[in-house]
């Protein structure tokens, strides 16, 4: 087999593009590789036309564990439902691809990116996005491409292009920038409270690299003799559009200018206008062109009515600087926030409301054993902070079956999770596993940013010592030719009929997360820069309102939350604490009714609903790991008797033996003649043998004094109530 290939090198890493070798029945297929990471990306289009007013595009990302040389767990030893990571990468492909297809296109299109080999130094997600563009172009599918994506990291003061997993973890920025020849079409970012200016510079840096990957795709197409299919809109009968414009422009415009009406009232009035038009058309004669046209396509009235509403709303913003609810372009909706709204059976709770968007967030404190184990190709093996986002149908006044979380819910949850992670306390300071659940009670735009705000409030209510509170807002855009208007805190209709949804989250210090999606074919960095800068005063305004509700962590945890103690032991003594077959640690947990977790680095975490029990377990473990020296004197308790001597517990969990010859200066016939089980005695450490066994003596030791058990100072990481 022979194929065509090209390559481009970034910071010493070569990206290779090869076509013509695999998946010959797909419209387009490309192998994209960097290091040992290899992906096969295919694009397939059917001629089936969907009777819908949207593009039926499906983007899938598949990763099999063989790509990392692993066999799946479970009885079947086969991959099952796609992991969350695969869902997020599938969304990452979809988001920059969708706006680059013609808005009139209704053919079914499916893009499948399959990770065949994974190099832990080279993340596969940005390669999948670039591969999706090239596969679509190779398949000669109408598309406003090429499009490409790169990742930018920040180590110290230096930007890094397509950093490794380790560099991402060590750095202060992880941003993915996707763009077309027209400009940027998608941004996804997490940052460690990065300034707006540094963030903008990173985006600009990333887009420069995107243009190089776009050129590489164009060169490969040229070498193959493939001409890009420029989308050309089919002829459309505009009879209905003209009729609606003539008969509906004035009534729709009046509705959009009723700034004091509610969303429900506006929706009802617009629906009434649409039904009246529908009724008028239905009353026409059967051979009337309008009636024939709408009877052949029942959704045409809805589609053209939406287009007219969109046109009028956008015109009002461009020309009058007013939005449908009467706000100025940079004005935030009314905000209310309250923490601690649920009983303390729920460890932390809060409700955040902005306009008609209302989110209830709850926080649960868990033990280290509650961490989520990751069974995918991500180098991270577990998650200790989880954010789950739920969007029930009643939040938008609808009815539908409630199923498992969909792609949108997973994506919104991941964004809110990413926004909070940079401000979470360290494991040694606060070793709890944290789960936040955000329930959207009402939705009218920017529920993901409402979830960020609700998460902050509920975490503080749970007593989590955040480094700083985080707030978020969604920025919008209306672009008509050269006229551009940036909107602050967009609501549902502005998201639906606008050109951009740009979510910005962060602290007073800087940005922690970004997510930008477009409905047009690209924007210059200058406009994106303006949006980021205008988001800051909105974020700080929201933050001020949140701090009126709760401005610091609760001083005490819920009485129903587990109590944790965390301390460090010598990693070489972990085996001593665990004991043969786990008997020692099992005995401690049963004796104290606690849960104990020990990490490879020697960090011990003890969990219990009883603070005294946790302290007792800590005392035992510290006794087990305390080094005993020859000559030390201890006051201990005789734990058992054997024919040749007695065992004495000199520290919690640590015993030594007094040989029968060391019980007294005189000869002893029977051990029981001197000591019995339960007696308290004072002993001296005579020697520690080569196997670490402690030999004790009573000879020459006064029995009315000596050292008592040491009382180590507990190291609680949360207040013990």
From Swiss-Prot:
MF terms in GO: 3'-5'-RNA exonuclease activity; magnesium ion binding; polyribonucleotide nucleotidyltransferase activity; RNA binding
Cofactor(s) the protein needs: Mg(2+)
Gene Ontology BP terms: mRNA catabolic process; RNA processing
Reaction equations catalysed: RNA(n+1) + phosphate = RNA(n) + a ribonucleoside 5'-diphosphate
A single GO cellular-component term on record: cytosol
Protein's cellular compartments: Cytoplasm
Enzyme Commission (EC) number: 2.7.7.8
Domain KH: 562-621
Transmembrane segments: none
Entry superkingdom: Bacteria
Family: Belongs to the polyribonucleotide nucleotidyltransferase family.
The protein's role, per its UniProt record: Involved in mRNA degradation. Catalyzes the phosphorolysis of single-stranded polyribonucleotides processively in the 3'- to 5'-direction.
Full protein name: Polyribonucleotide nucleotidyltransferase
Organism: Prochlorococcus marinus (strain MIT 9515)
Species lineage: Bacteria, Bacillati, Cyanobacteriota, Cyanophyceae, Synechococcales
Gene: pnp
